[in-house]
Swiss-Prot record:
CDD domains: Ribosomal_S8e_like. Coiled coil: none annotated. GO terms for molecular function: structural constituent of ribosome. Keywords: Ribonucleoprotein, Ribosomal protein. It comes from Dictyostelium discoideum (Social amoeba). InterPro entries: Ribosomal_eS8, Ribosomal_protein_eS8_euk, Ribosomal_Se8/biogenesis_NSA2. This is Small ribosomal subunit protein eS8. One of its GO terms (cellular component) is cytosolic small ribosomal subunit.
Length: 211
């Protein structure tokens, strides 16, 4: 038995070394960190199951490429690709090595959310207005009266933050991981919005300017 979570090997408050009066116990064992990484090109996700105390199962994710991320203001969740880790309050090494842990700030693919938004509200977002070329005609999609009425009712309550819209244009969202990939084998979280997004954007800007 290697890693142990006991206090027997710790020094006393006085600085004296404790005398070990019993051997390591099974219930005090520790395991190595999963250090979940993002899958490289063409690599499959890797999740291992571990039998733990009480006969339960833990799922140790070693390689992941996707996760379920929720968009709170729109009350939707979509499975999307994780692109890279951009910030971690604990350690810069976890950012450098693209390690997925709870609380990490990652960039995710915005395409699934963009597709849903455009279908749900019937508007085009994140696209720069460009001059039409000669002979280029707009595609007209026929919509039923009931669908137009539905889209009109949805448009009344439609509010899209400018920061979110610019991210949709870039094709990337900032998101926070809320699950524990090394324990549950999944990388789930939520999209950053409003003041929380502003806070992390400031932190990232500060980090860039310090280089």
């Amino acid at each position: 038995m290697g890693i142990s979570r006991d206090a027997l090997h710790k020094h006393r408050l006085t600085g004296a070394a404790r005398k070990c009066n019993y051997k390591k116990r099974k219930y005090e064992l520790g395991r190595q960190a999963a250090k979940t990484k993002i899958c490289s090109q063409g690599e499959e996700k890797r999740v291992r199951s571990i039998r733990v105390r009480g006969g339960h199962q833990k799922f140790r994710a070693l390689r992941l490429d996707t996760g379920n991320f929720s968009w709170a203001t729109e009350k939707i969740t979509r499975k999307c690709r994780i692109l890279n880790v951009v910030y971690n309050a604990t350690s810069n090494d976890l950012v450098r090595t693209n390690t997925l842990v709870k609380g990490s700030i990652v960039q995710i693919d915005a395409t699934p959310y963009k597709q849903w938004y455009e279908t749900h509200y019937g508007v085009v977002v994140g696209k720069k207005k460009s001059a039409k070329k000669d002979g280029e005609a707009e595609q007209v999609v026929k919509k039923s009266a009931s669908l137009l009425a539905k889209l009109a009712s949805r448009a009344k309550g439609r509010v899209l933050d400018s920061a979110i819209e610019s991210q949709i244009g870039e094709g990337r969202f900032f998101a926070r991981i809320t699950s524990r990939p090394g324990q549950v084998g999944k990388c789930d979280g939520y999209i950053l919005e409003a003041k929380e997004l502003e806070f992390y954007q400031r932190r990232l800007q500060k980090k860039k300017s310090a280089k």
